[in-house]
Amino acid sequence: MRIAMKIGLSALLLGGIGSVASASDAPRFSRFSYDGHTQEQAKVGPNQYRNPILSGYYPDPSVTRVGDDYYLVLSSFAHFPGLPIFTSKDLVNWTQIGNAIDRPGQLDFTGMKTSQAVFAPDISYHDGTFYIVNTCVECKGNFVITARNPAGPWSDPIWLPFEGIDPSIFWEGDKAYIVNNRAPAEPPRYDGHRAIWIQEYDWRAGKMVGESTQLINGGVDLSKKPVWIEGPHIFRKDGYYYLTAAEGGTSVNHSQVVLRSKQLRGPYQPFADNPILTQRDLNPGRRDPVTSAGHATLVQTQNGDWYATFLAVRPYEGDYYNIGRETFLLPVTWKDGWPIILPKGKAIPFVASKPRLPAGRPGPVPTSGDFGYIDEFDGRTLAMQWMGVRTPRAPVYRVEGGDLVLGHGTPIGDLTGAPAFVGRRQQHHNATISTTMRFAPDADGDRAGLVAMQSDRNYLFFGVSRTAGKSMLSLYATDQGKDRLIASVPAPTGPVTLTIRAMGDRMTFAYATTNGERTLATDVDARFLSTKAAGGFVGTLVGPYAWYR
């Protein structure tokens, strides 16, 4: 299927090219650059690919095939636009073609924390229409959106009255069934005791029909108190219904398990050699570990081969990682009628053989390995990779004359609205990120610069602010909502280039004017920007931010 690719955010997105503050002192950003390098060393041959296939904050991948084309959707939580959609010909080279949630009217994230809102989407295709079924946590619950073109536009949500999270659609002939994580039929025996349920979905009427059936209680073996069975998917092969799901929680005990049945509604028997994917049994002190692997989706190629997309993380030490959960790809082997993504005790490889598919081309925006890019803000609006936090009620930016101009938003941490912040994912632990800014604050508290944000309570601000009547170039760390001034100097006049150099758990901050570059702070501990320290499920975004009167 041929599709049209969106060239940027819609006019409504984050205010788009609509009206924002027209004051002459509005912060203006004229350039944004990113240069990232992997911490692991890996040589990629001509018939090989590199993991992860999507670097940085791209969790909970769901993949489907339509003809010779593959489509992928991922979680985005309270970031907006959300639910990024990618396409590929070879499962290796991916190009973003849109965001399924790209209009303020689709979902309202007001009042939500960064790691709330849209969790674990599932994408499928039937009778000329693409379907995404998803959960909006702290919103209205589970919903379906549809599109004839996966690049969009996607419909407004159709809300579905069932509880739980992580729904996916299984299609059998002209019937559809939704399988998801819910509370067990019995009172929970322990924390993390969940169940997998199935119910028919009338896709023509957009409603649930019939009775719900519990397929899995607790996990593979209830006597061992398995936790957080979730992210279920069903597919059929050789007369069996296979149910795969994540088990163990999203941290280092994460895994993927599989069960099968001759009947759709069970009973399901677990694979004797579960899990079919995990890294929890490996030496935690190994070099360049990949951990927390799970939440897989299996897909069959047009050649009959099987592959799995799944999430995992690359910590820089222990369980510390700032860049979020990433998307990996591995072949699936079949043994005695059971799928295996990775044998027990094996480490996820950074390099693997390419699928037997027509050669794909790298997309215009790199997603894997070492890469960089520059945004000169020379279009009519921002590229679709930019995201804000929560759904904007009013415009917070415009793009004009080669500048990104930020308007008025709420302060970071104020959940009642969207801040004037647009960011890109930090996709490498070793990265250099720069922007050039012009801003003269008028009142105490006014500020503009670069923000590295893991959550509403854990972020760094590096830029120009006004304090006690003086314009200062300052670096602030906000950890669990508490601000700490790290360094400050009188702000230079005129344009200033702000540069963040990330090196694992450390960051260096420099600024440059026509008089050259100077360092403001070195060896700044950045572990508070990790998921372990901040909590939640997202990765760090870095980009321009402003708050001013």
Where are these regions (language model features)?
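Sec/Tat signal peptide C-region and signal peptidase I cleavage site
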Residues: S19-A23
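Bacterial N-terminal signal peptides
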Residues: G8-G18
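Bacterial N-terminal signal peptides that target proteins for export
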Residues: M1-L9
